[in-house]
Amino acid sequence: MQLTSFTDYGLRALIYMASLPSGKMTSISEVTEVYGVSRNHMVKIINQLSRAGLVMAVRGKNGGIRLGKPAETIRIGDVVRELEPLTLVNCSHEFCHITAACRLKQVLQQAVQNFLHELDQYTLADMVKENPPLYKLLLVE
């Protein structure tokens, strides 16, 4: 299973914000510059993260973006659930004629649940705490 670039960059943006001193604002432009991502793409990602309460966006001259809640409370699995379409196969009747008797869908759903359960063991704080090499790469100290 490969995460979409939308989810990948969403996780990266959250990691960047979690690496900053607590409560410090950043900008979408700063995040896009760090990762070399399209601003339009990042705006969509930040909007979805904001709607989910994971990012707080403040408008105005002194505005910016920051984590919407403490990094210790943001589980990686929850971020993936929010950003990633987790349907591995299309099991609609018009697409697949064995849907009524197929057991593969259940197996794949269980695999996704196991994947998410594993991701739920880690928080955003786990990704950034005591990680000087990360801070150096992101140019935050």
Curated annotation (Swiss-Prot):
Pfam families: Rrf2
Single GO MF annotation: 2 iron, 2 sulfur cluster binding
Cofactor note: Binds 1 [2Fe-2S] cluster per subunit.
Keyword Iron-sulfur: yes
InterPro entries xrefs: TR_Rrf2-type_CS, Tscrpt_reg_Rrf2, Tscrpt_rep_HTH_NsrR, WH-like_DNA-bd_sf, WH_DNA-bd_sf
PROSITE patterns: HTH_RRF2_1, HTH_RRF2_2
Keyword entries, A-Z: 2Fe-2S, DNA-binding, Iron, Iron-sulfur, Metal-binding, Repressor, Transcription, Transcription regulation
Protein name: HTH-type transcriptional repressor NsrR
GO biological process: negative regulation of DNA-templated transcription
GO annotations of cellular component type: cytosol
Ranges annotated as DNA-binding: 28-51
Cofactor: [2Fe-2S] cluster
Species of origin: Pectobacterium atrosepticum (strain SCRI 1043 / ATCC BAA-672)
Every HTH rrf2-type domain range: 2-129
Function of the molecule: Nitric oxide-sensitive repressor of genes involved in protecting the cell against nitrosative stress. May require iron for activity.
Top-level division of the source organism's lineage: Bacteria
Residues that, per the record, bind [2Fe-2S] cluster: 91, 96, 102
